[in-house]
Regions:
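Residue-level signal for well-ordered alpha-helical scaffold segments within enzymatic catalytic domains
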Residues: 54-58, 109, 113, 132
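Alpha-helix N-cap/helix-start and coil->helix boundary motif
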Residues: 50, 126-127
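N-terminal nucleotide-binding beta1-loop-alpha1 segment
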Residues: 29-30
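Short, solvent-exposed loop/turn segments at secondary-structure junctions
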Residues: 37, 128-129
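N-terminal phosphate-binding or glycine-rich loops at protein starts, especially the Walker A/P-loop
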Residues: 34
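C-terminal capping/extension of enzyme domains
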Residues: 1-26, 48, 93-104, 108, ...
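Short, surface-exposed acidic-centric catalytic microdomains
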Residues: 37-98
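Internal catalytic-core helix/loop-beta-alpha segment
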Residues: 77-126
Length: 159
C-alpha cells in the first residue's frame, strides 16, 4: 500500500534524444527509454556497462565506437536506425520495472522516411511496450533481442 504523498513529486520524464536514422536505414533497433546515464550523455546506450556498442560492433565486424559522433557514423554506415519506444513516462532512475504513464514515440515518422526492413527490440521492456502501443498501429512485428543493459546479468557478449 502506498502512502498518500508517495507519488507527489513524480512527474513524467520526456525523452531527450532524437532518433538516429536516414533514408537508407534498413534495421530499426528500439530500446525502452534512455537510462539516467544516457540522458546525461545525450546519446543512446550511454552507460559504460551497457553492451549495445560491443554487440553491434561485433555483429558488423567493426571496432567499438567511442564518441557520440563515432557512434552516429557507425550506425548510419551500417544502415542501423536507433530510437526508443517511449517518448515520455514516469520512471524511477533507470529502472524499467518502474515505468508507468507511458506515451509512445511516433515511430511511423522513421518508417515513412527510411527503408526499414526489420525492427528489433532491445530487451523485454522495449518489446512489451512496442507490442502494446506500436505493433498494431504500424502493422509491423518486431523481434525481441536479449537486453544489452547491465541489469541483464544473465546474458553476456560471449554467449
Amino acid at each position: 500500500m502506498s502512502r498518500p504523498d508517495e507519488n507527489k513529486n513524480e512527474h513524467p520524464v520526456v525523452h531527450p534524444i532524437p532518433p538516429v536514422y536516414r533514408a537508407d536505414s534498413r534495421i530499426l533497433i528500439l530500446g525502452s527509454f534512455p537510462s539516467v546515464k544516457s540522458r546525461e550523455t545525450g546519446f543512446f546506450y550511454g552507460h559504460p556497462q551497457n553492451r549495445f556498442w560491443k554487440v553491434t560492433a561485433a555483429v558488423c565486424g567493426e571496432e567499438v565506437p567511442q564518441t557520440v559522433e563515432e557512434k552516429k557514423a557507425f550506425l548510419l554506415r551500417n544502415h542501423i536506425a536507433v530510437w526508443d519506444v517511449i517518448a515520455s513516462c514516469v520512471i524511477t532512475g533507470s529502472s524499467d520495472a518502474s515505468i508507468r504513464d507511458v506515451v509512445p514515440n511516433p515511430l511511423q515518422d522513421i518508417l515513412e522516411c527510411a527503408d526499414i526492413r526489420q525492427i528489433y527490440c532491445n530487451g523485454a521492456t522495449a518489446w512489451k511496450y512496442y507490442r502494446k502501443y506500436q505493433e498494431k498501429q504500424l502493422g509491423r512485428e518486431a523481434v525481441r533481442l536479449p537486453s544489452t543493459s547491465p541489469a541483464n546479468a544473465a546474458w553476456s557478449v560471449e554467449r
